[in-house]
Amino acid sequence: MGNVFFLLLFSLTHFPLAQQSRCTLTIGISSYHSSPCSPTQPVCTWNLDLNSLTTDQRLHPPCPNLITYSGFHKTYSLYLFPHWIKKPNRQGLGYYSPSYNDPCSLQCPYLGCQAWTSAYTGPVSSPSWKFHSDVNFTQEVSQVSLRLHFSKCGSSMTLLVDAPGYDPLWFITSEPTQPPPTSPPLVHDSDLEHVLTPSTSWTTKILKFIQLTLQSTNYSCMVCVDRSSLSSWHVLYTPNISIPQQTSSRTILFPSLALPAPPSQPFPWTHCYQPRLQAITTDNCNNSIILPPFSLAPVPPPATRRRRAVPIAVWLVSALAAGTGIAGGVTGSLSLASSKSLLLEVDKDISHLTQAIVKNHQNILRVAQYAAQNRRGLDLLFWEQGGLCKAIQEQCCFLNISNTHVSVLQERPPLEKRVITGWGLNWDLGLSQWAREALQTGITILALLLLVILFGPCILRQIQALPQRLQNRHNQYSLINPETML
């Protein structure tokens, strides 16, 4: 068994398992592993496909009541942010200040609202990220190459797609999560002629679409409208929403989600409908699309094994075993000595008690002798009446004092020879006292030696790896771009 153990120890020390650390990106139940990265090689890279991410999001949505989005006719440029952020510069060169919120609290289809300043994504103070040093990416149609600093692994991110004129590609259903309140009357076109021009038909469609959007989201969303692009929009997707026929409203087609006709560029919205104010204001709004949130988790690298000299380990384990055995033997001997002294003291107490009982027995015998003498004297006095018992008409009593129990107690062997010492087992085996003690000590040393052989190498490895762990804990992550000082 010892040869098998040392052969296993030799194979583990000379053939360590090498595995590099990675960062895992999780969407639904799908996992995407990055390229090998670590504090010394801090760039984690993924090659992602937007269509696959969309499928993962649709099959396994991260939130139970999240409104899903539809497909769109072309892939737009991406903006990559930490989970819910403010972006002061749209050229991708400024700081990205994360403001973390729960993505499952989304309630709006979020038409025309600015993603990073919308009402339900209020900012929360948190550390800043820089685009080129902490996170960056490149895109070719639907393929995205994502690069993340290893120190940011473990955070959450969201991909935002900049879709010109169209916020976002949510699919609006006709069954809201809770019954909406009574809708206010639809705004008349005549009240908006100074804002919405030049097409009355498109104006009516947009207003009706805003109204249906507000109803489906329980009037908790902001809807934005751009005046300059109303005449150039075209129908992209028609959701299956039933429209109740009202005599006061015009007959229109199904409301449509729209995009500006190519080659329009991203533009700021100029007018926004505020549900709380129930009016269209001239706030500046931007547009974006929210793709599924990402959950990042670092994969800890396995502990590296160093090559060690087997003879040193053998001698060290043997020395530990011998030392432990000697310590166990000394401890066992001291324990046996203390047990013997305790038995001797108990034996002395028993002998004293026996002597006291014997003395009391002797005193009782003397008293019995005196009583017998008095009995004989009384019998002589009542001899003419037939004796004492017949004279007092009582049953005669005779005293029989026995010394058997005391003699049995005195004849028993000493307590040390009758009590089993050690582990509570019957170690008699017909051996002498010193032979039994030697047998117990030998078995104790053998058991301790086996324990040291089994657990000694593991303890040694942990002790040798402790300085390296402490050193790695105090190392700071290096940055992709040292000039950013992040």
Curated annotation (Swiss-Prot):
Q: Where are the annotated glycans?
A: 136, 218, 240, 286, 400
Q: Which residues cross the membrane?
A: 439-459
**Signal peptide bounds:** 1-18
Motif mapping: CXXC: 221-224
The record ties this protein, via CDD domains, to: HTLV-1-like_HR1-HR2
CX6CC, short sequence motif: residues: 389-397
Q: List the disulfide bonds.
A: 221-224, 221-397, 389-396
| Biological processes, Gene Ontology terms | fusion of virus membrane with host plasma membrane; symbiont entry into host cell; virion attachment to host cell
Residue ranges that the Swiss-Prot or TrEMBL entry lists as coiled coil: 337-383, 393-425
Give the start-end ranges of region Fusion peptide: 309-329
Family annotation (InterPro entries):
TLV/ENV_coat_polyprotein (IPR018154)
What GO cellular component is one of the record's annotations? Answer: viral envelope
What does the entry report about post-translational modification of this chain? Specific enzymatic cleavages in vivo yield mature proteins. Envelope glycoproteins are synthesized as an inactive precursor that is N-glycosylated and processed likely by host cell furin or by a furin-like protease in the Golgi to yield the mature SU and TM proteins. The cleavage site between SU and TM requires the minimal sequence [KR]-X-[KR]-R. The CXXC motif is highly conserved across a broad range of retroviral envelope proteins. It is thought to participate in the formation of a labile disulfide bond possibly with the CX6CC motif present in the transmembrane protein. Isomerization of the intersubunit disulfide bond to an SU intrachain disulfide bond is thought to occur upon receptor recognition in order to allow membrane fusion.
Query: Which residues does the annotated region (Immunosuppression) include?
Result: 372-388
Q: Which UniProt keywords apply?
A: Cleavage on pair of basic residues, Coiled coil, Disulfide bond, Fusion of virus membrane with host cell membrane, Fusion of virus membrane with host membrane, Glycoprotein, Host cell membrane, Host membrane, Host-virus interaction, Lipoprotein, Membrane, Palmitate, Signal, Transmembrane, Transmembrane helix, Viral attachment to host cell, Viral envelope protein, Viral penetration into host cytoplasm, Virion, Virus entry into host cell
Q: Which Gene3D superfamilies does the record match to this protein?
A: 1.10.287.210
Which is one Pfam family of this protein?
TLV_coat
Instruction: Summarize subunit and interaction data from the UniProt record for this chain.
Output: The mature envelope protein (Env) consists of a trimer of SU-TM heterodimers attached by a labile interchain disulfide bond.
Domain notes, please? The 17 amino acids long immunosuppressive region is present in many retroviral envelope proteins. Synthetic peptides derived from this relatively conserved sequence inhibit immune function in vitro and in vivo.
List the protein's name: Envelope glycoprotein gp63
Q: Which gene encodes it?
A: env
